Swiss-Prot record:
It comes from Cyriopagopus hainanus. This is U4-theraphotoxin-Hhn1r. It comes from the Eukaryota. GO terms for cellular component: extracellular region; host cell postsynaptic membrane. Expressed by the venom gland. The keyword Oxidoreductase does not apply. Belongs to the neurotoxin 12 (Hwtx-2) family. 02 (Hwtx-2) subfamily.
Amino acid sequence: MKVTLIAILTCAAVLVLHTTAAEELEAESQLMEVGMPDTELAAVDEERLFKCSVSCEIEKEGNRDCKKKKCKGGWKCKFNMCVKV
């Protein structure tokens, strides 16, 4: 009985890990199908970091508290930078 339970739990864990890995590969392949190379993704990341920090600096120069600019598409503004959620 104990061995059967361990075998069932082990199979369930392997199935969950396999399913998760398959979903990651599928999501990654869909991103690559869009045709956006890694260099373009890096440029987008740098652009988001820059925009968020610049907007906070501009608000500080106007003698106002720095209100964090809202970042879109799974990003949030933290420490004057857009970071992935």
